[in-house]
Amino acid sequence: MSVAKSKESFPRSAHALLADLPEETLRRLEIYANLLEKWQRAINLAGKSSLDDVWVRHFADSLQVSQAVPDARRWLDLGSGAGFPGLVTAIKYADEPGALVHLVEANRRKCAFLQNVIRETSAPAIIHCGRLEKILPALDGKIEAVSARALAPLEALLRYAEKFVDQGAVGVFSKGKLFEAELTDSLTAGKYLITIIASQTCSAARLVLVRRRGG
């Protein structure tokens, strides 16, 4: 998973989502990519084939999440894993005053990895190491958007995010090709307004945006 090409035209040419990033953001993402490669040797952070294409499969894919709610700077990322999309969001907004991303992850080794990336990139993020069921009830403060990727079915995600969406946050959930099966009548006809956005990195994937009706 070499990032040497970034010294020439890569990663800007890898995907449109990367094209307009400031040099400092690209530098931080390159640090992130190198740490992924280093830590992957000891712990399973993500599938090896996906890390071979980390700039598109993970970084660009994560960038479209924050792009979907462009005014949000205070995020909550559920089940952060190796940091997609939450840590990428934090790196994107690293130089913006007031930006903060809460990363919730139960695996302590992954939490250690996330902390290492935060330290090396100065990303504005806080790690909450523990299960969602224990962390979320005690989490206070302004949250403008809630993200999750490859974590749980939509109904379960909404149970986790309900408190924050009811307070005005927007849920942004990355879903695969079977996402339509998760759009039950109870969700689409309930108190939430659901918007589907086509993924810019995978033709079969979608972003599911969830807002409180009237919010």
Each predicted region: which residue ranges?
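Conserved beta-strand segments of alpha/beta enzyme cores
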Residues: 100, 124-126, 170, 192-195
